[in-house]
């Protein structure tokens, strides 16, 4: 064992954020004291840090570390900015004024709000320098951080299966086809644990999935493996399965049977017959209902998750002092909001209000959770009753919108907590299989596991990694994952309306080697260039990377962008209520601008066919390439 234990990562190579869950709260408390001269206490619970502050926080040092709003005559104290930074929140400087006629108006100081955003970003960077200096001057603290980090994140060695344990041909497979080494190794891994086959296009995921299902069946770890594939590739996939395993008993759904009656007969065949492999189109798979018991468990988990996020929210009086004492739970899922009653009448009123808010939230969350599960399904046996004990899903990126609760506000770009109902259904089915198979027999496959948002890698870990393991790593909640491995920065970005705007964005990762190590515990990553001869068939990209071409803005595009800009400026001037009623405007304008940038005719069919459009430039470049490479 000593030979394979990873080398300890020295403290000077370890990065951590303001808010990393594995850091002792005393370090954050010392930082607040040093910068603001305010004594606070931090408590970690349910994926965030709660700050308990003293009654009196108004001192010169705290004020100078904060931000002042001349427009509203308000001051955001330094410790409040640090709290926002540690919770990855933004601060909006505003006030609500009531008029004599009973109406009210919310006034926002945009300059002070932007100043708070910039200051919070500065605090995140300043903390890293401050902590680094502390570690240099305090060797004992440095050693402790090094030990905690290595014990927590540097404790896994990626599996390496020796070639002598990999058969040339798996039992029952034709000897006319030999899997590549990376395929055979992935099959062996897939029979041992839940796994993401993060194999690039062209590396042979189809044969890997087929072989894994058949090996599960041969070894007796699964009696009824199901493979989910895209509708258009069902026939091709089944043909590949018969080619690799000529004697396999395979059930699939023909195109002519993809109707309600055909699906009903198909489900009966699944339940009452013995199959080596069941190949299901995605659309049919999504029609299979889940058991009521599993749905109820899902709903209860969602309620608990939502209440956990509610428990994170700061409840402050007019002076900005916290009135609620929060307690961390022993297990994150069992977090219960403990609202301590304070001795004053005001606190009693607030406590009653909070309990009412909690009850309403619980009710709303249950309704929301039920909506997440409400999708069109067939009236047939549920997935549990079909006795499927192995589930292999091709093109798994179709199910990456699992959704999650977060205390981060919408001010952080690159974070998408939205969900899709089909993803919820897949999650329930994977949980059913994991339960039946004692924590294995779930295989995902995709060439693009991470394509758009920071949440995707975390989402796939939720599918495949035991919740207890995620808790041990301190990444069970998305907010903890971001604080431990994310890098949030303020960046100047080009907006849909053609202006530059500073946004807080999930800009990348820190401690990437350790994150990759955790990810590799549930994934098998293969790039085309590493796939043994596959890359030889793919022509090299000109210049080694995509080329940027700059074109002048067309007259039609200029007119469309002027319209988009005017609409968005009008939207920015709306009140909060009006923005809520017209929430479709930003997305609509973004879609229009994106389409017009390709070709104005996608927005206005009467627009001219401009020779300077991206469409025409793409045609010219394609013709040039064809002529240059013509033999």
Q: What label would you give each PLM region?
A:
Residues 188-193, 203-221, 429-434, 464:
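Walker A/P-loop NTP-binding motif
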Residues 195-200, 226, 443-444:
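Short hydrophobic/aromatic beta-strand immediately N-terminal to the Walker A/P-loop
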Residues 200-201, 230, 448:
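P-loop (Walker A) phosphate-binding loop of NTP-binding proteins
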Residues 157-198:
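Conserved pre-motif I regulatory segment
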């Amino acid at each position: 064992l000593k030979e394979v234990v990873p080398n300890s990562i020295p403290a000077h190579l370890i990065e951590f954020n303001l808010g990393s869950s594995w850091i002792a709260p005393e370090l954050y408390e010392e930082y607040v004291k040093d910068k603001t001269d305010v004594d606070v206490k931090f408590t970690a619970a349910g994926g965030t840090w709660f700050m308990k502050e003293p009654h009196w926080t108004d001192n010169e040092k705290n004020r100078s570390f904060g931000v002042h709003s001349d427009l509203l005559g308000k001051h955001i104290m330094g410790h409040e900015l640090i709290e926002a930074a540690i919770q990855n929140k933004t601060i909006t400087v505003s006030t609500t004024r009531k008029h004599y006629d009973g109406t009210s108006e919310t006034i926002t100081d945009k300059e002070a709000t932007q100043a708070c955003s910039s200051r919070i970003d500065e605090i995140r960077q300043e903390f890293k320098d401050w902590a680094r200096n502390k570690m240099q001057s305090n060797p004992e603290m440095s050693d402790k951080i090094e030990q905690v980090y290595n014990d927590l994140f540097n404790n896994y060695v990626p599996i390496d299966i020796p070639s002598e344990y990999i058969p040339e041909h798996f039992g029952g497979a034709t000897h006319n086809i030999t899997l590549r080494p990376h395929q055979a190794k992935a099959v062996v891994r897939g029979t041992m644990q839940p796994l993401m086959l993060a194999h690039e296009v062209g590396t042979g995921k189809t044969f890997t999935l087929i072989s894994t299902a058949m090996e599960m069946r041969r070894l007796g770890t699964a009696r009824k493996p199901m493979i989910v594939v895209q509708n258009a590739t069902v026939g091709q996939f089944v043909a590949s399965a018969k080619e690799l395993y000529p004697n396999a008993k395979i059930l699939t759904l023909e195109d002519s049977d993809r109707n309600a009656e055909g699906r009903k007969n198909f489900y009966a065949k699944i339940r009452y017959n013995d199959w080596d492999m069941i190949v299901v189109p995605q659309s049919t798979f999504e029609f299979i209902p889940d058991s009521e018991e599993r749905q109820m468990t899902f709903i209860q988990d969602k309620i608990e998750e939502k209440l956990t996020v509610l428990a994170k929210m700061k409840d402050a009086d007019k002076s900005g002092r916290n009135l609620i004492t929060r307690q961390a739970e022993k297990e994150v899922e069992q977090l219960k909001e403990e609202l301590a009653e304070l001795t004053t009448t005001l606190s009693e009123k607030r406590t009653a209000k909070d309990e009412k808010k909690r009850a309403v939230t619980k009710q709303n969350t249950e309704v929301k959770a039920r909506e997440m599960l409400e999708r069109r399904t067939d009236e047939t046996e549920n997935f549990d009753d079909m006795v499927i004990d192995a589930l292999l899903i091709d093109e798994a990126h179709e199910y990456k919108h699992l959704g999650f609760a977060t205390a981060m506000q919408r001010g952080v770009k690159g974070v998408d907590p939205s969900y899709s109902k089909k993803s919820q259904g897949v999650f329930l089915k994977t949980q059913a299989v994991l339960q039946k198979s004692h924590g294995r027999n779930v295989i995902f496959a995709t060439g693009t596991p991470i394509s758009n948002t920071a949440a995707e890698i975390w989402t796939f870990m939720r599918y495949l990694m035991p919740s207890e393991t995620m808790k041990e790593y301190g990444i069970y909640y998305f907010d903890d994952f971001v604080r431990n491995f994310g890098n949030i920065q303020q960046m100047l970005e080009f907006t849909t309306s053609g202006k530059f705007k500073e946004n807080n964005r999930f800009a990348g990762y820190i401690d990437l080697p350790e994150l990759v190590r955790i990810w590799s515990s549930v994934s098998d990553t293969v790039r085309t260039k590493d796939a043994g001869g596959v890359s030889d068939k793919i022509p090299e990209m000109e210049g080694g990377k995509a080329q940027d071409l700059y074109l002048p803005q067309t007259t039609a595009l200029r007119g469309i962008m002027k319209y988009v800009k005017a609409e968005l400026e009008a939207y920015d001037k709306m009140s909060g209520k009006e923005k809520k009623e017209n929430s479709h405007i930003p997305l609509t304008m973004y879609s229009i601008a994106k389409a017009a940038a390709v070709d104005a005719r996608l927005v206005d069919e009467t627009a001219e066919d401009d020779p300077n459009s991206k469409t025409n430039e793409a045609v010219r470049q394609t013709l040039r390439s064809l002529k240059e490479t013509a033999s």
